[in-house]
């Protein structure tokens, strides 16, 4: 089911989950300009080209945020690793529903996986961390 939110300009946006709805409200509450699913990145799984659509782009900071309720399997986790390898200057961060939840088919949590792969992350409940991210000095040019 689609969830409806308004961006900072009052434009109605349909997002895909409650997590994305909550994240949109946090970004709007912090009065940071954001776009939803406007950034698309092509990436290659050996011998095949795929497209990944980022959930939230913060253009003036160069930050991309993916809201994840659940990292379902190795294939999905591999997608983010390939994106990181193929876009080394990209600042992709994760907001998880629960950082301590085990990744599908693995014996480690979402947070452990993100740390191991070098991604910044937090829980949707970590409003202050998201706020800190958005107050960082931009390295984006």
Name these PLM-found stretches:
Residues 1-141:
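Nucleic-acid endo/exonuclease domains
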């Amino acid at each position: 089911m689609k969830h409806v939110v308004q961006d900072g300009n009052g434009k109605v946006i349909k997002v895909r989950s409650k997590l994305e709805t909550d994240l949109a409200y946090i970004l709007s509450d912090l009065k940071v300009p954001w776009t939803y699913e406007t950034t698309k990145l092509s990436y290659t799984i050996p011998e095949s080209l795929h497209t990944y659509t980022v959930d939230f782009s913060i253009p003036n900071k160069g930050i991309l945020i993916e809201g994840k309720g659940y990292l379902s399997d190795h294939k999905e986790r591999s997608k983010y690793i390939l994106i990181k390898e193929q876009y080394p200057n990209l600042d992709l961060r994760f907001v998880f529903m629960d950082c301590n939840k085990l990744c599908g088919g693995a014996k480690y949590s979402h947070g452990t996986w993100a740390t191991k792969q070098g991604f910044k992350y937090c829980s949707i409940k970590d409003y202050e961390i998201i706020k800190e991210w958005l107050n960082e000095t931009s390295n984006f040019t």
